Amino acid sequence: KVYVNGVKLSNSGFWTFRFVRCDGVDISKVYVEGHANWNNDGFDIESRNVTITDCVVDTDDDAICFKSEDPDYVVENVTVKNCDLSSNCNFIKFGTASAGGFRNIRVSDCTLHKCSRSLLRFWEKRVPGVSDPITGIAGMALEVVDGGFMEDVVISDLTMEDVQTPLFIRLGRRKTSE
């Protein structure tokens, strides 16, 4: 089992935490600040039996992103609870890497709001109707575009502020010649 507790990480070179094919991850009381580049995700999860609790994530990119790049592997049995998530992109994202699938995932009791600063995106210059340079794009982005599946995903008791799209759902077929 992997335990990450009580650490603070700032401005990683890429995704701050990336868990791939782990069975048993317990993340608690972690502080992530990431504004160094476009891909400063907080947590990227492609594992099973994961718990993320009482964390603070302030990133320019996705705060928490669930990825499923292997068609023979399912991201499952994950709980995210009581987290304070700040983003200038997606707060909680499933996909777009979605070749396998997502099953039995719970997200609850989290606060989502715009990040503390932005050095990169400046949405008000790029998106019509957006007047604030710092704003979250999607509170929850549920994207299955690589042939995978999503089942038994429960999202409850989220508080969102300064989010352009509270819920974004995309089902598609990318990377295909059909």
Describe these PLM feature segments.
Residues K1-E178:
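Extracellular/periplasmic carbohydrate-active domains that bind, remodel
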